[in-house]
Each structure stands twice: as structure tokens, then as C-alpha cells.
């Protein structure tokens, strides 16, 4: 197993489009790269829902006397999430050590195979998940998702500082769900952290209608190329 690049997609607040943009990054690159998504949001996993894999349980395989989960596959994207492992109507009410253990299981007990890019859909906020991910994975860089809301901006600044303290590189941030009534955020809003792109409000994103035309219009493949080669 080899993973060439590991990219964390993060947000300080829930509901800003982080998981959707993670999926759209993966879909925009899946034609030319071997892509995986690690859904690190143990308490609120969404990737299996975004890819319509709600009712599918991961297959277990034995390799060298060890059990591994086969990642679910959709659109040539490998997806590992606690969502299909737990029943959808059951919440994971776990303390920090159990959360860290679940993340380690997803990382090390998933039969990823060879990947060009692994996107990590981070949980909102900061805390144990960030510490575990930073220790267990060699993250090449992170991308933050924020809206123009002052609350989102304030919390994003805190999460950026958390990544800096954990020595997680930061590629930049994406401003999501802008409309003609909102001013576009200043490129220097977070100091030396650049703005990678702005995404206008699009109903298709909220209804999870990830059509080829939507994927093409967002040009997230070009965004990836720009920040990965900077």
C-alpha cells in the first residue's frame, strides 16, 4: 500500500460545506488519479451519504492474519467511513480515547491499496481528531472551508492556529456559498494563508446533485493543481 499525497479538508464550523467540497475535490480528480476519502468525522460522518452508500456495509478481508475493511467504491473513489460500520440512526457517544481508536482503525484497518491522493474529511472544530490525525498521518497540507459569516471567519482563524501548532501545513482556504450580496473575503484575511478560490451559492451542492456540469464548473482540479505545485 502506498499513498502519494494526503490532503486534509477542514472547517472550524459545521454546515459550511466541508464534506461536500471534499467529495467534489475527489470527483474532479478521479478520472486522472487514484483517489481515496477518509471520513474522519466520527461523530457525524457524511461521505457515505454524499455518495449514496447508506445501505452498504464494508467487506472484511484477511491479509497476513489481520482483518481489513475493503473501502466502499463509488465513481472510482475509495471511501472509508464509520457511517456504514455504525447504524445510521445510532450516534457514536465516545470519549476522546475511543474516538482516537476509531480513527486509527479507519486509517490502519482499511485496505486502501495504492492511492495518488487521500482526502481526509476532518471533523469541524479542533480537538482529539486533529491531534490523532497529525500523529498518525503524514499530511502534505490542509485546505480550510469557510463562509463569509463573521462567526465562521473567527473560528476558522482558531483552527488555522491549531494546525500551525500541530505542524500541519496549510495550502489555503476556500470561501464557500458567496452570493451577490456578500463581499468577497480579503485574500489576506488570514495573514499568510492564501485564498484558493471562491464558490458561489449553488443549489446543486446543497441537494447533492454532483453532476458532471457542476464538477466541471467549479474547476477544483485546477485549484488542486495550483496549490499542490506551489
List the predicted regions and their residue ranges.
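Phosphate-binding loop that captures ATP/GTP phosphates
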Residues: 33-36, 40-85
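Conserved Switch II/interswitch segment of TRAFAC-class P-loop GTPases
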Residues: 113-126, 138-159
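Phosphate-binding/switch loop-helix module in NTP-utilizing enzymes
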Residues: 83-133
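Conserved beta-strand segments of the P-loop GTPase G domain that flank and frequently precede/overlap
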Residues: 81-82, 143-147, 173-176
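C-terminal lobe/tail of nucleotide-utilizing enzymes
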Residues: 160-230
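Walker A/P-loop phosphate-binding motif and the immediately C-terminal alpha-helix
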Residues: 5-39, 173
Amino acid at each position: 500500500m502506498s499513498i502519494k499525497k494526503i490532503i486534509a479538508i477542514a472547517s472550524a464550523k459545521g454546515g459550511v460545506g466541508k464534506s461536500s467540497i471534499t467529495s467534489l475535490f475527489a470527483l474532479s480528480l478521479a478520472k486522472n488519479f487514484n483517489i481515496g476519502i477518509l471520513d474522519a468525522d466520527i461523530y457525524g460522518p457524511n461521505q457515505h451519504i454524499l455518495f449514496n452508500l447508506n445501505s452498504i456495509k464494508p467487506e472484511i478481508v484477511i491479509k497476513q492474519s489481520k482483518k481489513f475493511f475493503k473501502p466502499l467504491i463509488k465513481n472510482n473513489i475509495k471511501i472509508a467511513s464509520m457511517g456504514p460500520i455504525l447504524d445510521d440512526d445510532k450516534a457514536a457517544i465516545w470519549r476522546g480515547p475511543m474516538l482516537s481508536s476509531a480513527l486509527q482503525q479507519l486509517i490502519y484497518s482499511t485496505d486502501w491499496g495504492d492511492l495518488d491522493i487521500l482526502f481526509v474529511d476532518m471533523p469541524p472544530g479542533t480537538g482529539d481528531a486533529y491531534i490523532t490525525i497529525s500523529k498518525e498521518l503524514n499530511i502534505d497540507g490542509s485546505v480550510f472551508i469557510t463562509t463569509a459569516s463573521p462567526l465562521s471567519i473567527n473560528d476558522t482563524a482558531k483552527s488555522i492556529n491549531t494546525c500551525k501548532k500541530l505542524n500541519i501545513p496549510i495550502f489555503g482556504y476556500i470561501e464557500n456559498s458567496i452570493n451577490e450580496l456578500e463581499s468577497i473575503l480579503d485574500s489576506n484575511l488570514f495573514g499568510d494563508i492564501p485564498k484558493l478560490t471562491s464558490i458561489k451559492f449553488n443549489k446543486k451542492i446543497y441537494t447533492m446533485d454532483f453532476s458532471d456540469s457542476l464538477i466541471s464548473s467549479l474547476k477544483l482540479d485546477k485549484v488542486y493543481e495550483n496549490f499542490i505545485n506551489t
